[in-house]
């Protein structure tokens, strides 16, 4: 019931909301990395357990590079540690996002393709698809089950006055096991606390903060499409632009179904290297 009420509330709000870029944890909008810039980010997902489950910590690092104004690539490295169990490396991901349209429109599509070389101990939950995973399996067993997966997303994003509104539709295929196609979604809305600069140089001015909310979850698979045995989360998100290079993010996600974790706490720190591509080109005697 909570899930249905949240879905209805978000759908009712979307037509009335008014957009700007906001870095969500799960939802993607249409803004890509600036060409030649490299952003390095470390993020952590903390899973608060139900009775009989164990607390886990799932850190990951991401390296995002703006190849062109309409193409961004990212490499992810991830791990996981479970209380009373062990810490394991859970794999890597290589992601590419493409903007087919050069200009900005009322609705801006982005095409997303990702290859994942991970194992079943992965807990970063960068997306939620299919049915809810079994998080009670020991790391020694889960880490031995490897998966090669292809994930695609259709990202639709709009900027309306001071609001960003984004919708992601996810399809994932496990190439290692016959699980059919798995489906998921992510919806997000966000805005800055202030749109006009105060004129003062300060770290805590309102224009340095973006706030918003995400709703994301799984939609089953071709073997059984729908909400049965799926995880769904509603998550406020706050982003603090500390400087031109540094930003901090935080999001407490609330599980909406029994199959979800009761709470997911997410933290992120990112540092952006402006003009990284040009500097590397100069180092090797090439053109920036």
Explain the meaning of each model-derived region:
Residues 4-14:
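Bacterial N-terminal signal peptides
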Residues 19-288:
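Transmembrane beta-barrel domains of Gram-negative outer membranes and organellar outer membranes
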């Amino acid at each position: 019931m909570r899930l249905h009420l949240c879905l209805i509330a978000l759908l009712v709000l979307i037509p009335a909301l008014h957009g700007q870029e906001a870095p969500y944890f799960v939802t993607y909008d249409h803004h890509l990395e600036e060409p030649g810039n490299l952003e390095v980010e470390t993020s952590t997902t903390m899973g608060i357990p139900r009775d009989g489950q164990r607390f886990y910590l799932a850190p990951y690092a991401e390296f995002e590079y703006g190849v062109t104004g309409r193409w961004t690539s990212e490499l992810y490295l991830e791990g996981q540690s479970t209380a009373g169990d062990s810490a394991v490396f859970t794999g890597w991901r290589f992601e590419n996002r493409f903007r087919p349209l050069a200009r900005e429109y009322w609705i801006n599509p982005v095409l997303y393709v990702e290859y994942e070389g991970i194992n079943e101990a992965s807990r970063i939950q960068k997306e939620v698809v299919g049915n809810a995973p079994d998080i009670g399996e020991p790391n020694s067993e889960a880490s031995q089950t490897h998966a090669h997966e292809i994930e695609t997303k259709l990202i639709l994003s709009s900027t309306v006055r001071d609001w960003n509104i984004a919708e992601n539709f996810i399809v994932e295929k496990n190439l290692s096991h016959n699980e059919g196609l798995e489906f998921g979604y992510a919806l997000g809305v966000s805005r800055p606390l202030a749109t006009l600069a105060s004129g003062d140089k300060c770290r805590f001015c309102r224009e340095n903060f973006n706030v918003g909310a995400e709703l994301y979850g799984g939609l089953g698979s071709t073997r059984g499409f729908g909400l049965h045995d799926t995880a769904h989360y509603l998550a406020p998100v706050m982003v603090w632009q500390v400087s031109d290079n540094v930003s901090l993010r935080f999001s407490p996600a609330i599980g909406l179904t029994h199959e979800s974790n009761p709470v997911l706490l997410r933290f992120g720190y990112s540092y952006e290297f402006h003009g990284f591509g040009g500097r590397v080109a100069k180092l090797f005697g090439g053109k920036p």
